[in-house]
Structures are given as structure tokens and as C-alpha cells.
């Protein structure tokens, strides 16, 4: 399970990248439908997450990250595998 620190850090990044209030960034929030991200927003957000967490997220994996929880789970899995 992702740590509260990881979740908080991810929320800050998503809020900055997508220009949304952190209160709207809940685990089940979908980036495109709920947080109004377009494809460019998603690319920039993924790049920022890669830098912040020191992980590489290949395009084919990035396409599967649809919700905040998906992002948390993916990053946690990558960090544990490192």
C-alpha cells in the first residue's frame, strides 16, 4: 500500500500539473474524465512523476494509468522492484 508521504507528493504534482485543487485528487479520480487532463497534460504529468520518484514509466505503461490510484500503485511497484 502506498505510503501517505507518497500519496501526498503525488497529489501535489498532479495538482500543479493539472491546475486542480488537491481536494479533488482522490484515489478513484480519473485523470481525463474527473480532473480534465488532456493528452499533453498527461505526458507532462508522467514526466514529472518520473523525475519526482526516480522511476521510468514507459509509454505503454503510462497509457494504462487512468486514475490516481493507478499511478500510486504503479510507482509503488516500481520502487519496490528497484
From Swiss-Prot:
Pfam name, any one: PP-binding
GO annotation, cellular component aspect: cytosol; membrane
Subcellular location: Cytoplasm
Gene Ontology biological process terms, A to Z: lipid A biosynthetic process
Post-translation changes: 4'-phosphopantetheine is transferred from CoA to a specific serine of apo-ACP by AcpS. This modification is essential for activity because fatty acids are bound in thioester linkage to the sulfhydryl of the prosthetic group.
InterPro entries: ACP (IPR003231), ACP-like_sf (IPR036736), PP-bd_ACP (IPR009081), Ppantetheine_attach_site (IPR006162)
Domain Carrier: 4-79
Residues where O-(pantetheine 4'-phosphoryl)serine is found: 39
One function term, GO molecular function aspect: acyl carrier activity
PROSITE patterns per the UniProt record, alphabetical: CARRIER (PS50075), PHOSPHOPANTETHEINE (PS00012)
Pathway given in the UniProt record: Lipid metabolism; fatty acid biosynthesis
Record keywords, A-Z: Cytoplasm, Fatty acid biosynthesis, Fatty acid metabolism, Lipid biosynthesis, Lipid metabolism, Phosphopantetheine, Phosphoprotein
The organism's place on the tree of life at top rank: Bacteria
Family in the record: Belongs to the acyl carrier protein (ACP) family.
HAMAP family: Acyl_carrier (MF_01217)
Function as written in the Swiss-Prot or TrEMBL entry: Carrier of the growing fatty acid chain in fatty acid biosynthesis.
Protein name in UniProt: Acyl carrier protein
Amino acid at each position: 500500500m502506498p505510503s501517505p508521504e507518497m500519496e501526498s507528493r503525488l497529489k501535489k504534482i498532479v495538482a500543479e500539473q493539472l491546475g486542480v485543487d488537491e481536494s479533488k485528487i482522490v484515489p478513484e479520480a480519473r485523470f481525463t474524465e474527473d480532473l480534465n487532463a488532456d493528452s499533453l497534460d498527461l505526458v507532462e504529468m508522467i514526466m514529472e512523476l518520473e523525475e519526482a520518484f526516480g522511476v521510468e514509466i514507459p509509454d505503454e505503461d503510462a497509457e494504462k494509468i487512468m486514475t490516481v490510484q493507478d499511478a500510486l500503485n504503479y510507482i509503488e511497484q516500481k520502487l519496490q522492484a528497484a
